[in-house]
C-alpha cells in the first residue's frame, strides 16, 4: 500500500520516514474467581474463550475492591477487563426486590461512546441486568425509571454534574448501592476540562460516603505516561495501573508524510505547502481505488466533509458511493449505519473527526490516514490503532500540516517513536475550577471540615472568600451552605471558558446558526468578520456584546479575516526561577490584558493582505500561569543580535515555542498564548512569555517549565532545520498572530535560542524534583490574590490562545 502511494504521481519525496512495528503474540490467562458463568458464556459466544493476561489482571484487582486504571493500546479489550467483574457483581443482586442489588455508573466523554458501551454490555449479560442511557436526550418519563430500576447507568460528566449530583435525593437508592464507577477514555480529561471532571468525581465520592457507599473506580485509558498518577489526580484515590498489553497485534507500517510546496505564497512571500486535508483527499482516493479499507482522521467537522467530497469527486461512480464522512452532529442512527457499513466492507473510505477515535468499535481497517498531528502521542496511537485489528497487518500515515509542530515531527521521527507517550496534564487545585465546585457541593449538602479534606488543601482558604462574595454562609456548627436561589451547578460549564455564549443569528431570517464561546467572540465574530457555517459563508454585520448576539448575512467575499490585537502582560508573582548562565527561566503568575483593535482582509488563495479595518472593542483581562525566559544585553551582543533585530528574534522564538509545546504537554497550540517583549518593565530584560489560556492556569505552562530544555531545544531545531529563507508557516509564522506575523527574524531567533540554551545543561525536567515547578495553591486570579506589582508591560508581539478570555484569530 505504501509503495503504491509513494511512487504514484511522483510522491516519493513526500515520504520522510517509515517505521516498521513488529507483530505481537497474544498472552492468555484463566478466568479469575468471581466472574459469573453467564458472563463467561456470553464472552464465549463473542469468540473469547480466555481473557488476555491484562484483562484478567484488571478483573482480579476489581474483584478485590482496588481502584484500577487500564492503559493499553487500541483494540486491547479494555471494556471486557472492567465489564466482566462489574456485570458479575450486578448479576449477584438481580434477586433483590426491585430487581437490582449493586449498581454501577459509567462515564464517557461523548454520547456516542456511551451508546456503544450499552451495546457491548448488552452482549455480555442477560436482560435482567438493566442497562440504561441517561443523558440530555433521555425523555422525562424514562428518567424516573432509570433512577429507580437501572443497575448500570451510562452517562457523561456533564449530566453527572448538572443532573445526578444536584438531584441526589432522587438517586439515593442508586448511590447507596453504587459499587463501581467506570471512567472511560480517561486520558481525554485533560487541562481545565479534566480539572472540572476531577472535582465532579470528588463531589460524587462525597455524596456516596453520605449514603454509605464507597465505589471502586475502574478507569480505561489510551497508552499514556504515569496512568496511576493521572488516575489519582482525577479521582483523588490511589489506583493500580495495568499497562502490560497482552493482546495480539499485526505488523504495522507507520509512515510520516510531508505535502508538497505549492506555487502560492503566503504572508510576506512565505512558501506554502498543500494542506494536510487536501493531501489526505488524494491519498484516500488512491487507497479506495485499490480496494483498501481506510479511515482518514481530520481536525474539524468541515474538513471531514471536504475530504470525503474530494475523494468522491475524484473516484466517480460507482466507487464514490463507498466513501462517506463521519462526525459529531450526525444522528446516532446515521453513525451506527456508517460504522456497520465500514465493518461489512460496504464502505471503503471514511473521513472522520475524533468522534471515531474514542472507543467506538470499528475493526478490520487496512489503513489509517491522519491529516495533521492530533495533538498528543496518546491520540496519535489511538487513531493509528484503528488499523490492523484482529492481528492483521496495516498502514498508518501521519500527514503533516504546514505548522512548526507537524513539520518538526515528520523530520524528527524519534520524537514519536523513541519517546514515551506523554502524561495527561490537569490541575484539580486551580482555584477558578475549585471555587464553583465548592459552591455546587455546598448546594448538594452543607460542607463540613471532613469534606474539605476530599477537595484538597486549596479548598479551605477559598471558603471565606466565597462567603465574602455572598455565595456561601457558615452555620454555627461550622458547616457551609449555599445561599442563592439559583442552582449552583448552573454556574459551572465543564467544557466552556466562562461567560454567556454569543448567539450567531442570520439577520434576514432570525434563524440561529450556532453559538461561540464568549471568550472567542472578539476574534471570531467581530463586526466585519467572515464566518463559515456548514460550508456557507457569512459576513458579521454587527456584534452586540450586551445582548450576546452576532448578526450575520450570507455573502461570498474573496477574502478571509484575521483579527489584530494589542496585548500586555505583567508578572503578579514568581514561584521559582532557574539560572541558565546569564539567562533565567521562571514560572509563576501573570495578568494578561488583550484588546482586539482591528482586522485584516486576506485574499483566500494567496493570503495577500487586501486591507485593514479598525474595531473598538473593550479589553479583556486574564490571570493565569506562565513560563518565561530572559536574556541579557551582553548575551545579545555575543550572539550578534542588534537591537533592531531583537523584536523579530524574540517574536519568532515565541511563535515556534508555542507551536512545539504541545509535544511536551497534552495541549493544543490554541490552549496557550505568548508574548515577546524587547524590554519588559517587570524583568528589566528582553522576555518571552508562554502562558495558559485559561483563568488560573491549566498546567501546560508548568509542564513547559519542567521540560524546558527539551522543549526549547526542539523549538530551536524546528526553526533551524526549515528550508525556507526568512520564515514560513512550517517554522515561525503563526496562524493566530495578532500582529500579522510582523516582525519575524528567523535567523536571529535561532541565535537567541542558542544563547539561552548554552547555559542550560542542568535545566528543569520532569525527573528532577529539585528543579521542577511547584503546584499552584495560590494561583493567580484566586479571590483575594494580590494585584500586579507594576503596570502591565507593553509587548511588541503577542500570540493569543483561542480558549483564553481573549482568543486568537482562527487558523487552520
Predicted regions span which residues?
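Small-residue-biased low-complexity repeat regions
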Residues: 762, 767, 772-802, 808
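Generic structural signal for buried aliphatic residues
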Residues: 57-58, 68, 531, 538
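Short cysteine clusters
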Residues: 722-731
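Helicase motor core with emphasis on the C-terminal RecA-like subdomain
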Residues: 3-46, 50-53, 57, 63-69, ...
